[in-house]
Regions:
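Membrane-embedded alpha-helical bundles of multi-pass transporters/translocases
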Residues: 1-168
């Protein structure tokens, strides 16, 4: 149960940067405007709602090897990592198309991870109570991931205010 739940910790860590930091970063720092940034992120989420059932159907009907959920998760992790990196490290002239494109790529990657991962948890047991325990453990790991990100943010902010320098 713990081994299955561990990826939820890693999957949830980027949620704070994406949902809290990203809108202000693009809207204010990159001067896209908050309304345009919000609309771009809305379009990406609409795309996400379309891809969720499609990925579910594909991952159910086209198993890859014996552990047919894991390869989808691995592929999605790579796609999500690329999308996340690009969103958090944009070029100076990144505009609305850049934000929409890389957000869609990130959400596609997250969908390729989340849909097979959540389904896999339901397939680990036929016992109702055990499936409840599996889900509880997974969701607890997800909350710990979000809290970990919060702690990292607070520590990095505090260390930065103490004039700690990054080594090159």
């Amino acid at each position: 149960m713990l081994i299955y739940s561990f990826p939820a910790l890693a999957i949830s860590i980027p949620t704070i940067p994406i949902y809290i930091y990203l809108p202000t970063f693009y809207g204010v720092t990159l001067e896209l405007g908050l309304a345009a940034t919000g609309f771009a992120l809305l379009l990406a989420r609409v795309f996400d709602t379309i891809t969720d059932p499609i990925v579910g159907i594909i991952s159910d009907r086209f198993p890859i090897k014996r552990n047919y959920r894991k390869p989808w998760i691995a592929i999605g992790s790579i796609i999500a990592a690329i999308g996340l990196y690009q969103l958090l490290n944009p070029a100076n002239d990144a505009g609305i198309v850049y934000l929409i494109s890389w957000s869609i790529i990130l959400y596609l990657g997250w969908t390729l991870v989340a849909v097979p991962y959540l389904t896999w948890g339901a397939e680990l047991s036929t016992d109702y109570n055990e499936r409840t325990s599996i889900t509880t453990t997974r969701e607890t790991a997800g909350i710990l991931g979000i809290l970990t990100c919060g702690v990292i943010f607070v520590l990095s902010t505090n260390l930065n205010s103490l004039k700690w320098k990054q080594s090159a």
